[in-house]
């Protein structure tokens, strides 16, 4: 069980209050619960309210909810109204994705959009819709958030903190609340060092005061970056800061209610469910790096070679969320339960190994085309900066011409735009990839041991058995298939294309040396020119 601790302080976990009435059953607020239920049995006939349902995690969550039981109830998905497509069209497009192909129209009709704003009181719902939700909803999954590390503090507070408060307010109004699950992040405590416990670490600021501040226009006049740093202090960005505030808020508000916090680390594609290698649009998070790498657009990373990159399959995050819904919904708990969904403690993968795996993987499964040979390497400091400007940014500016003329490259944005995003993302992730963060799995392992035998394989979230090479293979093939719309099958044509491109790649080094040799020997003479040509060429190869 989780309690608020002072920056890493440890307190004993309060015991479960079973209020037993025999046969593994107990009552909460007049509702009979049973610890003997399987996970599908728990979700049968349950009506669910989901925020963040149109995002990558949310989409996989909706599919997983539909998959739990044929008799699952209505899945209400919060959708913003002011978008390119109206809410019904957005949900229709979402349900056309490959992961929903196996479901009938009748089953898909259970997914219902509800238009609202996350930070508005009662989400801005009309009285009839609000009453329907109060009467019918049993489970809330809250994953909506602004995940941009560079989000202005006011925006992050309104979305991540106030938005969480709105879901809590709804949960407290529900007539039959069975479970409330908040999707946080393992990095919400990245301002701490050592082993991060599955507990809520006390924030330096009152979440209620921060919400009031977000609504006070005068507080944001002349609000500089320096003032922002005064608030987030030792947090690396507004995202982790407001996620920690949200956890503090949830602990204060949800005592005695069936609530849980799930903290995933760096979320990648799916390992098994709903299909191998599902990556969504591959635009968000670290998956965007893999998408750029597949085409040879991104070819460098910065970070400590020995630092653990704590990645986790998306379906493990969803499985842990479903398990936590079942767990808190079948027991009487005194405090919200917290688990990490991470891999670093049980199956560590360091950055050097990660780079080797993705280089080997793309060689086994090359795409239809590249901008340049996909090969990535760790660099730091001036070496990283020089390589980025010489071999990323400068070529991207030149590449604008063939992009426009022949339509090659990555979808949606130009290579130059991707480079700008890549540079910002690299700086943001550098904080996390240059340090060793360790996350306790004590609660996660304890709860996973309670999963009914019949559910353990389907709802597994134990990363200790993950084969990272196979997993990265699936992610890269998924990016080819779902993002670049290429065939997932690697043929002899792909392998021959890779061999030809390799010849051109190494021939490029010969051409560079020849240009340097002739240019320098003509101007400086044979001895000096040759020496300089070898030195410059060797430096570029090393770089």
UniProtKB/Swiss-Prot annotation:
Residue ranges, annotated region (Disordered): 1-29
Localisation per UniProt entry: Membrane
Membrane topology, as annotated: Multi-pass membrane protein
UniProt-listed Gene3D superfamilies: NAD(P)-binding Rossmann-like Domain
EC number: 1.2.1.84
Reaction catalyzed: a long-chain fatty acyl-CoA + 2 NADPH + 2 H(+) = a long-chain primary fatty alcohol + 2 NADP(+) + CoA; hexadecanoyl-CoA + 2 NADPH + 2 H(+) = hexadecan-1-ol + 2 NADP(+) + CoA; octadecanoyl-CoA + 2 NADPH + 2 H(+) = octadecan-1-ol + 2 NADP(+) + CoA
UniProt superkingdom: Eukaryota
One Gene Ontology molecular-function label: alcohol-forming very long-chain fatty acyl-CoA reductase activity
Keywords: Lipid biosynthesis, Lipid metabolism, Membrane, NADP, Oxidoreductase, Transmembrane, Transmembrane helix
GO process annotations (BP): long-chain fatty-acyl-CoA metabolic process; wax biosynthetic process
CDD domains: FAR-N_SDR_e (cd05236), FAR_C (cd09071)
Keyword NADP: yes
GO cellular component, one term: peroxisome
Biased composition range(s): Polar residues: 8-22
InterPro entries: FAR, FAR_C, Far_NAD-bd, NAD(P)-bd_dom_sf
Pfam family, one: Sterile
Membrane-crossing residue ranges in chain numbering: 386-406, 500-520, 522-542
Protein family (similarity comment): Belongs to the fatty acyl-CoA reductase family.
Function as written in the Swiss-Prot or TrEMBL entry: Catalyzes the reduction of C16 or C18 fatty acyl-CoA to fatty alcohols.
Protein name, UniProt field: Putative fatty acyl-CoA reductase CG8303
Organism ancestry: Eukaryota, Metazoa, Ecdysozoa, Arthropoda, Hexapoda
């Amino acid at each position: 069980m989780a309690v608020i601790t002072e920056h890493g302080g440890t307190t004993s976990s309060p015991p479960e209050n079973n209020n037993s009435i025999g046969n593994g059953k107990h009552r909460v607020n007049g509702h009979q619960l049973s610890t003997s239920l399987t996970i599908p049995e728990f979700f049968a006939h349950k009506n669910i309210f989901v925020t963040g349902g149109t995002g990558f995690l949310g989409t996989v969550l909706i599919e997983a909810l539909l998959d739990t039981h044929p008799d699952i109830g209505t899945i209400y998905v919060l959708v913003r109204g002011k978008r390119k497509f109206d809410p019904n069209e957005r949900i229709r497009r979402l349900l056309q994705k490959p992961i929903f192909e196996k479901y009938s129209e009748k089953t898909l009709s259970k997914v219902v959009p509800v238009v609202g704003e996350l930070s508005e009181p009662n989400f801005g719902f009309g009285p009839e819709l609000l009453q329907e939700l109060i009467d019918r909803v049993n489970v809330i999954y809250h994953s909506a958030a602004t995940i941009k590390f560079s989000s202005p503090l006011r925006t992050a507070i309104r979305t991540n903190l106030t938005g969480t408060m709105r879901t809590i307010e709804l949960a407290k109004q529900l007539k039959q609340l069975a479970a409330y699950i908040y999707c946080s992040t393992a990095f919400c405590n990245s301002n701490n060092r050592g082993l991060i416990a599955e507990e809520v670490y006390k924030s330096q600021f009152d979440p209620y005061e921060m919400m009031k501040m977000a609504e006070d226009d005068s507080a944001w006049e002349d609000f500089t970056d320096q003032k922002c740093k005064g608030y987030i202090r030792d947090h690396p960005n507004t995202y982790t800061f407001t996620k920690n505030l949200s956890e503090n808020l949830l602990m204060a508000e949800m005592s005695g209610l069936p609530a849980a916090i799930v903290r995933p680390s760096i979320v990648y594609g799916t390992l098994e469910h709903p299909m191998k290698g599902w990556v969504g649009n591959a635009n968000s998070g670290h998956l965007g790096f893999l998408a750029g790498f597949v085409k040879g657009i991104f070819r460098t990373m910065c970070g400590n070679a020995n630092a653990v990159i704590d990645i986790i399959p998306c379906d493990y995050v969803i499985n842990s969320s479903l398990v936590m819904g079942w767990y808190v919904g079948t027991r009487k708990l005194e405090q919200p339960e917290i688990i990490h969904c991470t891999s670093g403690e049980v199956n560590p993968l360091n950055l050097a190994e990660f780079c080797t795996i993705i280089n080997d993987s793309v060689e086994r499964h090359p795409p239809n085309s590249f901008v340049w040979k996909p090969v990535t390497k760790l660099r730091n400091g001036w070496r990283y900066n020089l390589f980025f400007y010489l071999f990323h940014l400068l070529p991207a500016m030149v590449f604008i011409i063939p992009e426009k003329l022949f339509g090659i490259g990555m979808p949606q944005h130009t290579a130059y735009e991707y480079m700008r995003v890549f540079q910002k993302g690299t700086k943001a992730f550098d904080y996390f990839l240059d340090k060793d963060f360790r996350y306790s799995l004590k609660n996660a392992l304890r709860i996973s041991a309670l999963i009914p035998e019949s559910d353990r394989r389907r709802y597994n979230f134990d990363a200790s058995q993950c084969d990272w090479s196979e997993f990265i293979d699936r992610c890269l093939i998924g990016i080819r298939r779902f993002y670049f719309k290429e065939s997932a099958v690697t043929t002899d044509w792909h392998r021959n294309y890779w061999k030809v491109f390799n010849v051109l790649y190494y021939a490029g080094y010969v051409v560079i040396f020849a240009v340097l040799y002739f240019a320098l020997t003509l101007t400086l003479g044979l001895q000096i020119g040759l020496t300089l040509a070898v030195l410059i060429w060797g430096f570029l190869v090393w770089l």
